[in-house]
Regions:
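Feature captures hydrophobic
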Residues: 1-115
Length: 115
């Protein structure tokens, strides 16, 4: 899988999340290592989510993981806290804000179950 294919798939998964109740401004950068290597960011602002294939220099947190790990996290098949504990996910920056990633994934999972 190429980075472009991986990014399109992950973007689709995260865009499914209804973040309208999250009013905080949060920015996460994701560094993909190994196959499909690349960088993208997720920004939450005013209840909207934006995902772009660029570096975000003023990020709250930075996550580094393999494509498989990030895909499983985005699908709700792997808990990001467990992934961090098992050293499958590296986190740098504001840990309190980084933990909000789980909130976004949980919101997406609830919406998927309602469909």
């Amino acid at each position: 899988m190429t980075y472009s294919e991986f990014f399109a798939e992950i973007k689709g998964k995260f865009l499914e999340a209804d973040v309208s109740n999250i009013k905080d401004h949060l920015t996460f950068q994701f560094n993909i290592i190994g196959e499909a290597q690349g960088i993208f960011y997720i920004e939450l602002k005013n209840g909207k989510i934006r995902i772009e294939p660029y570096v975000y220099n003023d990020r709250d947190a930075m996550f580094t993981a393999s494509p498989d790990t990030l895909k499983r996290i985005a699908e709700g098949k792997m808990d990001p806290i467990w992934a961090f504990t098992m050293q499958k996910l590296k986190v740098e920056g504001n840990i309190d804000k980084a933990l909000r990633l789980k909130e976004i994934i949980d919101l997406k999972q609830k919406q998927t179950k309602k469909k």
